[in-house]
Amino acid sequence: MAKLILTHEVTGLGAAGDVVEVKDGYARNFLLPRGFALTWTKGGEKQVESIKAARAARAHASVEAAQAQAQALSSKKVKLEVKAGESGRLFGTVKPADVAAAVEAAGLGAIDKRNVELPNHIKSVGSYTANVRLHEDVSAVIDLEVVAAK
């Protein structure tokens, strides 16, 4: 068994800065050549501390960025132009991908379509709200204005 310090997050093994014990072949053939880990040494404790400090700083920065984007998203109304009939019924429905594209087109930053939660199917023009998960701890509510395309 080889004792290693992870330098990157490895699925099923741990996060950067974790000290793990793995089989020699896994360490020699996968983790070490790809730079995912360093061999454990007595001076490795300092490396572990610096890796964990860098990870904490990145996590703090990502939370702050997500909070800033959430504030920007909540303060603006996003307009979606969709093909619709004369009665206001849409030809299809508004999907999370449509909302993500409209947010990016409005200049409010890129969001992942998988993080958009629509409360119900949007099948007619009008005003709606959608929830967006920007981070593990941060979410925003977007006001949507669905209008008929000309």
From Swiss-Prot:
Primary gene name: rplI
Lineage start: Bacteria, Bacillati, Actinomycetota, Actinomycetes, Micrococcales
One Gene Ontology cellular component annotation held by this UniProt entry: ribonucleoprotein complex
Listed name of the protein: Large ribosomal subunit protein bL9
GO terms for biological process, alphabetical: translation
Membrane-crossing residue ranges in chain numbering: none
Keywords annotated in UniProt: Ribonucleoprotein, Ribosomal protein, RNA-binding, rRNA-binding
Family the entry assigns: Belongs to the bacterial ribosomal protein bL9 family.
GO molecular function: rRNA binding; structural constituent of ribosome
A Pfam family the protein falls into: Ribosomal_L9_N
HAMAP family documented for this protein: Ribosomal_bL9
Function, in words: Binds to the 23S rRNA.
InterPro entries found in the cross-reference section: Ribosomal_bL9, Ribosomal_bL9/RNase_H1_N, Ribosomal_bL9_bac/chp, Ribosomal_bL9_C, Ribosomal_bL9_C_sf, Ribosomal_bL9_N, Ribosomal_bL9_N_sf
